[in-house]
Amino acid sequence: MAKQQRTVLIIGAGIAGLTTSRLLTNNGIPNIVFEASTPDRSQGFAISLQEFGYSTLLSALGDLPLSSLIKGVAPDRVIGGTGWIDQALRDNRTGELLVAPELTTTKQTVVRANRNALRQWIADCGDEELDVRYGHKLQRVEGKAGNITAVFENKAKYNGSLIIAADGVNSTVRSQVLPSVVPETIPLIHYHGEFQLSRTKFDELIRPYSGHSNILVGVGDRFNTPLSICNMSKSHVHLDWSYSRTVKEGNDLLYRPNLPSEEAKKIPLALVEELGALDLAGPWKHFLNPESLKSHRVFHWTTRCVYMTQDDARSAGEKGIVFVGDSWHAMPIFGGEGGNHALLDGVELSNAIVTAMASTEKDYWSKAVASYYSSAWKRSQEAVRRSTQRFFLLHRPAADWREIAEKKRRTT
């Protein structure tokens, strides 16, 4: 019983942090989640959950049915939708269907999930409420495995057995214990816009192209313009768009990595002019244009990835620090697998901790960390490389897309 009095300190209330907390709590292991932001923090955009991610989570939560997840997180859940996506790619200058995966099974293998709803659903999957403390921005960590302290900017201090760094791509924990591991900036332009439509307008402008899919992906000549449903009700639809492309040679006015947060919310004139010159087809032309931008919330996103060597991960583990989520395997959002691996991290780490604490060994925290990294390191780091490669492939020249479409037609 003495082991179970130890508290695990989790830094970050994102998908990885909450998954770990929920599973530890369900297994009777005390833990506290610390989040720098306030409870009203919003990340309402949608992500794609793949079968390898959601099935592992559902199993860990007690073999919950997929329908439970869908009813809780699908962007179109309110109207009876399932978060389905067609995984098709269309030419955003003609509307022509370029790539459409052949459906070999009726089973839904990808579920679109509203990020806010997913965090809440995970937090609610247990009898005991999670202990999440907002407004706690980490300042530093002290100590070692088994006796480690987290010190916060609000002067609060908490002692625990282990610190789980779930604090994202710009991890404060990582920057302190592994200062040489820094995010790598991907040379791509990425702007993200949020807007709302009435159901009538949505059915008129987007539904003819998207059908029941929760995302409509448009690809062009080295640039992409996906439209995605974030939340849908009977009367309104909250959507977002992305505009991403490769960096141009010379002085690219839109390539501005490391912008301050307030500056990233401003719409540069160069973006307005560029979108106005794209000559997009419907429905993209209705939203990615200079006039529409005036009523949209627009953000500049810097695309980063994080790689971590196994030696670095183990070194931090010896100090009582273990990483989950984007803090050690950040990858591109579009075409990436980050959310899925965040779920796997939470499941695998909690399993390792539960198993180690049930053993009679003295150095059980180190055993738990070593067990977790024995499989999670290779899995996650390979995913970063795979996702980054896929991100560039999705920004290929228009001629390549046409060639792919033509080959597809010949073989069908």
Curated annotation (Swiss-Prot):
Question: What's its top-level EC category?
Answer: oxidoreductase
Gene3D superfamilies for the chain = FAD/NAD(P)-binding domain
- UniProt keyword Flavoprotein, yes or no: yes
* Chain residues that bind FAD: E35, A46, R119, D326, G339
Question: Which superkingdom, per the lineage?
Answer: Eukaryota
Any idea of its EC number?
Answer: 1.-.-.-
Per the UniProt entry, the disulfide pairs are none
Question: Which positions make up the signal peptide?
Answer: 1-21
Mind telling me which SUPFAM superfamilies this protein's record contains? FAD/NAD(P)-binding domain (SSF51905)
Q: Which residues are glycosylated?
A: N92, N147, N159, N170, N231
Q: Which Pfam families match?
A: FAD_binding_3
What keywords would UniProt list here?
FAD, Flavoprotein, Glycoprotein, Monooxygenase, Oxidoreductase, Signal
Q: Name one GO molecular function term.
A: monooxygenase activity
Keyword Signal in annotation: yes
Functional pathway: Secondary metabolite biosynthesis
Cofactor(s) it depends on: FAD
Q: To which protein family does this belong? A: Belongs to the paxM FAD-dependent monooxygenase family.
Per its database record, what is this protein's job? FAD-dependent monooxygenase; part of the gene cluster that mediates the biosynthesis of neosartoricin B, a prenylated anthracenone that probably exhibits T-cell antiproliferative activity, suggestive of a physiological role as an immunosuppressive agent. The non-reducing polyketide synthase nscA probably synthesizes and cyclizes the decaketide backbone. The hydrolase nscB then mediates the product release through hydrolysis followed by spontaneous decarboxylation. The prenyltransferase nscD catalyzes the addition of the dimethylallyl group to the aromatic C5.
For this entry, the protein name equals: FAD-dependent monooxygenase nscC
The protein's organism comes out as: Arthroderma gypseum (strain ATCC MYA-4604 / CBS 118893) (Microsporum gypseum)
List the top taxonomic levels of the source.
Eukaryota, Fungi, Dikarya, Ascomycota, Pezizomycotina
